Amino acid sequence: MVDNRRTFTAPQSLLETNLTFPNDEPSLTTITVTRERCVDPSLIDSFLRFLRHGSDDIIRQKLNNYRKGSINGKNKCKEFLKQELYPNWQIRNNIISFCEKEAAEMKNETDQQCGNNKKTTAEPLIDARIDPYAARERAEKQEAQYKDWTKVTEWVANNRKIEQILTSTTEGILRQNCEQNNDYLKEFTQFCKDNS
């Protein structure tokens, strides 16, 4: 197992907002993501919540703030997208992708440990008349070995769905407040290609 880790920092625009947090709950502005954090994602979930709140949850307020300082509405939207929203989405996407890659590596490692590759021979099946619990024990053993992988893949799928819902909702708000004919999700994909 390779010790993979990536550090992510919240966009500067989130760090300078007028949002205040109680003293007993410091805001999480930087996170180092590892396989262990993907398996137990409570800290990652907090960081993603912070990022989501700082952009998608308060998008109307953010757009209003940009509107005050800009004469041209299209420029305020472009500025908001490039400086705040798209970098935020990209960080969230990168965190989820990191855990997705870790899950794939976990599956490969577990397959090799369990001998589930088609190239290796599986342990012999025991006749149910000799040991009636053998099949169940074998299934439980395999399930236990794949538990962490299953947990991470379910977390990734759940967060991909959350991101899909948030980005489509945000795109609707952007179409109402900015340019109706823009495809903001395609623009985000291009933004990621340009900034990777």
UniProtKB/Swiss-Prot annotation:
InterPro entries: MIX23 (IPR019171), MIX23_fungal (IPR016805). A motif (Cx13C motif) lies at residues 178-192. Its main location: mitochondrion. A motif (Cx14C motif) lies at residues 99-114. GO terms for cellular component: cytoplasm; mitochondrial intermembrane space; mitochondrion. The keyword Amino-acid biosynthesis does not apply. One of its GO terms (biological process) is protein transport. It comes from the Eukaryota. It holds the Pfam family MIX23. Keywords: Mitochondrion, Protein transport, Transport. Regulator of the mitochondrial protein import machinery that is localized in the mitochondrial intermembrane space (IMS) and facilitates the transport of proteins from the cytosol into the mitochondrial matrix. Not essential for mitochondrial protein import but induced and required when mitochondrial import is compromised. Stimulates or stabilizes the translocation into the mitochondria of proteins such as OXA1, ATP1 and COX12. Present with 768 molecules/cell in log phase SD medium. Belongs to the MIX23 family. This is Mitochondrial intermembrane space cysteine motif-containing protein MIX23. The lineage of its organism: Eukaryota, Fungi, Dikarya, Ascomycota, Saccharomycotina.
